[in-house]
From Swiss-Prot:
Name of the protein: Anthrone oxygenase
Transmembrane segments: 12-32, 54-74, 86-106, 172-192
Topology of the protein relative to the lipid bilayer: Multi-pass membrane protein
Disruption-associated phenotype: Impairs the production of monodictyphenone, but leads to the accumulation of endocrocin.
Keywords: Glycoprotein, Membrane, Monooxygenase, Oxidoreductase, Transmembrane, Transmembrane helix
A GO term for molecular function: monooxygenase activity
Main function: Anthrone oxygenase; part of the gene cluster that mediates the biosynthesis of monodictyphenone, a prenyl xanthone derivative. The pathway begins with the synthesis of atrochrysone thioester by the polyketide synthase (PKS) mdpG. The atrochrysone carboxyl ACP thioesterase mdpF then breaks the thioester bond and releases the atrochrysone carboxylic acid from mdpG. The atrochrysone carboxylic acid is then converted to atrochrysone which is further transformed into emodin anthrone by mdpH-1 and mdpH-2.
Species of provenance: Emericella nidulans (strain FGSC A4 / ATCC 38163 / CBS 112.46 / NRRL 194 / M139) (Aspergillus nidulans)
Intracellular or extracellular location(s): Membrane
Enzyme class at the top of the EC tree: oxidoreductase
Pfam families (alphabetical): Anthrone_oxy
Glycosylation sites: N130, N138, N147
EC number: 1.10.3.-
Length: 192
């Protein structure tokens, strides 16, 4: 079994890595997407793929890191040593998961919905629906943030709306990234 010091150091390193990986999504990846994508379906698809790959690894790292901190808290508590700080650090590391469900799910849902709608209807437009006059029927009518109706119940994302949603997501994600960063900073204190 690894020593307690090794577990503490591992938790700090994984938490720091987690926070760094998350912060780069808001400070590098999303800004690059916003600056280089001028076609809403492409921008949405790139965000969905970025989210997919982040979703595979980042929550897992968060949970594994929190488990390390909770183990440290239990170990120290069983030996009548200070344990609350380790438990708090574990909580701060894992709180990004419920933060996503509570704070970000609405924006995530809008982005996923727009991407799915654009994907589902792209074939319709590629097959000549625009040439048949369907797009002009009510193309200026807005139906919520990020999309516009283009006839017969089909909604397509606008670039301005998608960008607005991604900027909102970027800031919420940056806030979410601060939880494991705070945990890593506080985690250093449990190693001394």
């Amino acid at each position: 079994m690894a020593s307690l010091t090794t577990l503490k150091n591992t938790a700090i390193v994984t938490g720091s890595f987690l926070s760094g990986a998350m912060i780069t999504l808001s400070t590098i990846t999303v800004p690059v997407l916003l600056e280089t994508s001028t076609h809403p379906p492409q921008l949405l698809h790139q965000w969905v793929r970025t989210y997919h790959y982040g979703h595979i690894s980042l929550p897992t790292i968060s949970i594994a890191t929190a488990i390390l901190y909770f183990y440290i808290a239990a170990y120290q508590g069983a030996r009548e040593q200070p344990w609350r700080k380790a438990a708090l650090v574990g909580f701060l590391t894992i709180v990004m998961v419920p933060f996503t469900w509570i704070v970000m799910s609405s924006t995530n849902g809008m982005l996923f919905g727009l991407e799915a709608g654009n994907r589902d209807h792209s074939q319709f437009f590629e097959q000549g629906a625009n040439r048949s006059g369907l797009k002009g029927a009510n193309s200026s009518q807005s139906h919520g943030l990020g999309n516009v109706s283009v006839g017969i119940g089909v909604e397509m994302a606008t670039l301005e709306g998608v960008r607005e949603l991604l900027v909102r997501w970027k800031w919420m994600h940056l806030v979410r990234s601060l939880f494991p960063l705070m945990a890593a900073v506080l985690g250093v204190g449990i190693c001394v």
